[in-house]
Amino acid sequence: MVLFHSQASCCKRVKADAIVLPFWQVQDKVRCAASIVEEYEPLYQVALENFAGKTGEAELIYSYGQGKEKRILLLGLGKNEELSSQDVLEAYAKATRILRKAKCTTVNIVLPVISELRISAEDFLSNLTSGILSLNYNYPKYTKECQSSEPLLTKVTVLGIVPKIADRIFRKEESIFEGVYLTRDLVNGNADEVTPQKLANIAKGLAKEFPSVDAKILNKDAILKEKMGLLAAVAKGSAVDPCFIVLSYQGKPKSKDHTVLIGKGVTFDSGGLDLKPGKAMLTMKEDMAGAATALGILSGVAALELPVNVTAIIPATENAIDGASYKMGDVYIGMSGLSVEIGSTDAEGRLILADAITYALKYCKPTRIIDFATLTGAMVVSLGESVAGFFSNNDVLAQDLSEASAETGEALWRLPLVEKYDKALQSDIADMKNIGSNRAGAITAALFLRRFLEDQPVAWAHLDIAGTAYREKDEDPYPKYASGFGVRCLIYYIEKFLSK
């Protein structure tokens, strides 16, 4: 994907469908933040009568043939002294939404005067690029026409920046968003198409694309041989075989530092015998968003050739129903040897993650484990669609993730591992139950996973992305449906804190 181009001079720009001009809000007035594109000044001066320049405010007007573009988009950036990176991202995401609705495919963007910016030019450009890329995406529709009524942007030329500086940022963000789009495509895809085997094939494809990536796929027989009794139990009711995916990237082979990403890969969740209501099942193709996130992150890390070692582990299965489905009240033994009494077959995600954690500890020698899962409805109730809750046994890891969250705008909120709630997982007939009481569900789910670390000195974080992975409405800077949430944040974390 090469969408972005750059040019130092506005005067020599090529023709385009639209030009985007930035504006500052200065007390009660509005001022163009860029070096004036003179031919358009009379036109936009008229439009400024009803334009305040607030952050994200936008107005699209016609140029009436007076320049090289057919339309002019006035884009408010608010007050310069208050400008944040997230403001930039959201403003240009909104601009993208407006331009696509107007069927503009080629766009010239004039940067503000660099010396006036409160944030660095690199930061501004990076977030501008991310904002545009985030909404330059189409949900894979299954209509007869198979075409979106809003065409994608095909060429974006950023004016007022030295190409040598800009192009490096563009290529980096484009590589990251290849991972975001991969995540979105997998989450948005039909559950009958995005099966465990499909996820395995995606992993194999990444191994072919990147020389430093290797894929290992365990089939049903290999899963049983490894005594992954929890993953095997969840898979019992499905006509589709499970698989266990191990995708390894070696960017620094001599280093012992090793990050393991674990993604919940339930490709469709009926709830099992503890059947979900029909309405709750409508979006359950998204229950493999953790797996898709792990694949998207590893894709981005490999594309950027970061000097780190990262392994993505994906336990993949459906949670379906037939006469062989695993049953409530029964006890199953995981790869760790720990036994679990099934209090609900709809608490299946933590079961397959438990076997994945055990596998990582046995074979991968991880420095840290970070898991991603659409795990609990309790998290959606607590934090909604805009914030993902996370838990960690390590303050340094938690702080670094929080900083990455703040820098990328993908909001994470650390929640406590309340020790006394662990008692809710006690069982009279097994080492533990897979559900606690009807309270603090997100916390008890995290405490369940922590048990499988078995006191090993491994930093661990659990991200419950149940609310953020799939959105019911458009809200800048995310499209409706799959968001790709977490990919940018974790790539930033890996690059900043681990690429040393």
Curated annotation (Swiss-Prot):
Question: Which Gene Ontology terms describe the biological processes this protein takes part in?
Answer: proteolysis
What SUPFAM superfamilies does UniProt report for this protein, alphabetically? Macro domain-like, Zn-dependent exopeptidases
Its recorded reaction(s) are: Release of an N-terminal amino acid, Xaa-|-Yaa-, in which Xaa is preferably Leu, but may be other amino acids including Pro although not Arg or Lys, and Yaa may be Pro. Amino acid amides and methyl esters are also readily hydrolyzed, but rates on arylamides are exceedingly low; Release of an N-terminal amino acid, preferentially leucine, but not glutamic or aspartic acids
- Record has Metal-binding as a keyword: yes
List membrane-spanning regions.
none
Where is this protein found? Answer: Cytoplasm
- E.C. number(s) listed in UniProt: 3.4.11.1, 3.4.11.10
The UniProt keyword set, sorted, is: Aminopeptidase, Cytoplasm, Hydrolase, Manganese, Metal-binding, Protease
Q: Which InterPro entries match?
A: Leucine_aapep/pepB (IPR011356), Macro_dom-like (IPR043472), Peptidase_M17_C (IPR000819), Peptidase_M17_leu_NH2_pept (IPR023042), Peptidase_M17_N (IPR008283)
One GO molecular-function entry: metalloaminopeptidase activity
Quick check: keyword Metal-binding in the entry?
yes
Please give the cofactor(s) recorded in the UniProt entry for this protein. Mn(2+)
Q: Where does Mn(2+) 1 bind?
A: 269, 346, 348
Any idea what job this protein has? Answer: Presumably involved in the processing and regular turnover of intracellular proteins. Catalyzes the removal of unsubstituted N-terminal amino acids from various peptides.
Q: Read off the HAMAP family from this record.
A: Cytosol_peptidase_M17 (MF_00181)
Output the NCBIfam families linked to this UniProt entry.
PRK00913.1-4 (NF002074), PRK00913.2-5 (NF002078), PRK00913.3-5 (NF002083)
Q: Which family does it belong to?
A: Belongs to the peptidase M17 family.
Protein name according to UniProt: Probable cytosol aminopeptidase
| Protein source organism | Chlamydia felis (strain Fe/C-56) (Chlamydophila felis)
**Name of the gene this protein is made from:** pepA
